[in-house]
């Protein structure tokens, strides 16, 4: 959402800032905390996203992928002396900041419903853009919602995959565009991409 705002550059930078250090907020993005606070105040994730969009002066609209609270679980290698050992890490921040290499992710709970309006937005779109963003914690989770994956598979819209300019340690370090597609196929084999940027 913060990436959509041109007029409010300083706010955009603030929303994208991740806290450093080792405290309770370490690794958390300011924007996610603001969104969570607004969600608690309004009781509605869509209303909270609309409020964040208004704060940032965004012209478009962002919808949550699901109306239920979700967590991310990742299969990670490279955390033990034996590189074949796979450990499960749970939580967006833990996955995004792991010193290991993420191999696969899943949602908790699995098979959540899509949020109101998301499937309709995909069905009526001319172009659907996947990314940019944290590959395993922002992009892939969207295709793990069954209704969204089905909508992305059937839509006649052009599907554009936008890769990050720089790799993310633990998530996409050393990934080629082909590896990104391979991981997408592992998680959502029914989705074809038309363009990669």
Indicate where each model-derived feature is located.
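Conserved phosphate- and dinucleotide-binding cores of soluble alpha/beta proteins
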Residues: 1, 97-99, 108-115, 121-123, ...
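Electropositive, gly/pro-rich neighborhoods at or near active sites that engage anionic ligands
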Residues: 1-100
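General "foldedness" signal
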Residues: 48, 52, 62, 66, ...
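Glycine-rich beta-strand-to-loop/alpha-helix junction loops that act as flexible
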Residues: 131-134
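Extended, charge-enriched "interface" segments that sit outside catalytic cores
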Residues: 196
């Amino acid at each position: 959402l913060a990436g959509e705002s041109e007029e409010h550059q300083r706010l955009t930078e603030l929303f994208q800032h991740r806290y450093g250090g080792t405290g309770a907020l370490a690794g958390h993005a300011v924007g996610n905390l603001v969104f969570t606070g607004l969600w608690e105040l309004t009781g509605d994730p869509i209303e909270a996203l609309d409020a964040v969009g208004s704060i940032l002066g965004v012209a478009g609209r962002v919808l949550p992928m699901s109306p239920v609270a979700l967590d991310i679980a990742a299969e990670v290698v490279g955390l033990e002396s034996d590189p074949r050992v796979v450990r499960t890490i749970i939580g967006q921040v833990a996955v995004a900041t792991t010193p290991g290499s993420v191999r696969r992710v899943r949602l908790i709970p699995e098979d959540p419903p899509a949020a109101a309006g998301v499937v309709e937005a995909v069905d009526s779109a001319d172009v659907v853009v996947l990314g940019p963003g944290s590959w395993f914690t922002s992009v892939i989770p969207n295709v793990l919602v069954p209704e969204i994956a089905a909508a992305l598979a059937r839509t006649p819209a052009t599907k554009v995959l936008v890769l990050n300019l720089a790799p993310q340690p633990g998530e996409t370090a050393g990934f080629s565009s082909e590896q990104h597609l391979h991981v997408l196929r592992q998680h959502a084999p029914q989705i074809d991409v038309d363009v990669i940027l």
